[in-house]
Amino acid sequence: MPLILMCGYPCSGKTRRAQELRDYFTQNTGRKVHIVGDEDQGIDKNSVYADSQKEKNLRGALRAEVERKVNKDDIVILDSLNYIKGYRYELFCLIKHTQTPHCLVYSLTSADLSSEWNKDREADSQYTQEILDALILRFEAPDSRNRWDSPLFTIQQDDSLPFEAICDALFKRKAPPPNQSTKSQPLSSTNFLYELDKVTQDVLMAVLESQKTSVPGDLISIPGATEKIELTRSLNMVELRKLRRQFISYTKMHPTENIGQIANMFVQYLNKSMH
């Protein structure tokens, strides 16, 4: 049955809200409720969130646990930061694939309040200030205009959860139908859309920077790629952005399981487009 995605800064009250939701649904629907979260993974969060690969592995483990628990009867609550829009999109693809309704509960706090609540925790449960600040800086707020962030319920510190509205969103709304893009999306690769967006942007900026000291005929090395750009002519920002959009659209429909190859694929695409 439905997936409830918690979202918010570290120490923003997500776990308390997840527990309130579990208690409500257990008492009022009789359904089994599963809370999946960072704590279940037995992690040292300061170590994990300081290392991008460890964090990526954590997201993959959480997504896999959600996928295992989603079924036609139970409610699953994912109690984690869920702060990357690409990861939320991947979870949206998962629920479309399994024909399951979902909603997002956004625990909205200020950075100062989250920092204050962090200091109130037991010492072994606190984030370091450096990690806390970094996560807040990287946070990508949900936007109800994005289908993967909708329905969206934004809850501030003193608000009560709108239980009935959340129930309506989960039980009276049809699950999103699968379509070609979600069938093609490689659900086994964590954060595919985020990586696609980031890597292609990095390649684009590397090309623009290298062109300042290059001339037609040069080979341009790109960080993260073994392939090189064959600079047959100069490319301006407008053209590069257009090519990047075209490549992203194509790759969404024809995804690769190996996200480490995205940079090489984009370089090859640019080389073909210049000839």
UniProtKB/Swiss-Prot annotation:
Keywords linked to the UniProt accession: ATP-binding, Nucleotide-binding
Protein residues bound to ATP: G8, Y9, P10, C11, S12, G13, K14, T15
InterPro entries in UniProt: KTI12/PSTK, P-loop_NTPase
A single MF term (Gene Ontology): ATP binding
KW Nucleotide-binding (keyword) present: yes
Biological process annotations from GO: tRNA wobble uridine modification
Keyword ATP-binding among UniProt keywords: yes
Coiled-coil residue spans: none
Family the UniProt entry places it in: Belongs to the KTI12 family.
Name of the protein: Protein KTI12 homolog
Gene source species: Danio rerio (Zebrafish)
Protein's gene: kti12
